[in-house]
């Protein structure tokens, strides 16, 4: 058995068929992390803008965080249908690195993502951008309203689906996001592989409006920030 939480590193335990613990195979003393000012993430809940649902987010604060001070925020996103990014498990060392540079690191599960049942997951069918943009904006505004986030220093980053997420934030949500790093993105899902796309979007000829709404290219006229796009060869 293997398990962890946001405040406990992973433990690997050998159990018998009845579930009785026999031996701890591997564990990490969290004091080794605390020696480097490890900051434990917090899982938060906030309302969607339309008030229809409570959403889950996870926040990693800088080690020297002081309530009442506003900090730059890096939003790490993915957002593809059926995926999940907010977990009660041991956290990312990359997020820790960013937090130690003075950033608040924020991630959330928008409507259409996983972990909340089939009906929640299916809300993004046919338009992957609709709730991803709205719900992420609600999360960022929640951090602004509670006095944590500097509204003039909000950035996004992600890889693959997260690269798409970043492009969407810098365009459709350009009123909130200033900078972004988009790695290996899909900017228009008409140009991506059909076996992945069509199970969430339907056929392009049957859902032109949904593909248009999902495409980052539909919102490039709103772009006013700085975006670094990275990809392989």
Please annotate each region the language model reported.
Residues 1-233:
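Serine-hydrolase catalytic core recognition
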């Amino acid at each position: 058995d293997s398990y962890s939480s946001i405040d406990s590193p992973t433990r690997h335990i050998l159990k018998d068929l009845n579930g009785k613990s026999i031996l701890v195979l591997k564990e990490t003393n969290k004091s080794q992390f605390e020696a480097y000012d490890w900051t434990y993430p917090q899982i938060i809940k906030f309302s969607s803008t339309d008030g229809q649902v409570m959403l889950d987010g996870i926040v990693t604060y800088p080690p020297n965080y002081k309530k009442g001070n506003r900090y730059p925020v890096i939003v790490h996103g993915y957002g593809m249908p059926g995926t999940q990014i907010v977990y009660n498990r041991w956290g990312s060392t990359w997020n820790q690195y960013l937090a130690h540079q003075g950033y608040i690191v924020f991630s959330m599960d928008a409507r259409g993502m996983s972990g909340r049942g089939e009906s929640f997951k299916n809300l993004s069918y046919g338009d992957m951008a609709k709730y991803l943009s709205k719900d992420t904006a609600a999360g960022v505004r929640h951090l602004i309203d509670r006095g944590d986030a500097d509204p003039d220093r909000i950035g996004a980053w992600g890889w693959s689906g997260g690269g798409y997420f970043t492009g969407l934030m810098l365009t459709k949500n350009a009123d909130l996001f200033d900078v972004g790093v988009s790695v290996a993105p899909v900017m228009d899902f008409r140009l991506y592989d059909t076996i992945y796309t069509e199970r969430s979007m339907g056929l392009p000829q049957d859902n032109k409006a949904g593909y248009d709404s999902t495409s980052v290219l539909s919102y490039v006229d709103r772009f006013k920030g700085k975006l670094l796009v990275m990809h392989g060869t």
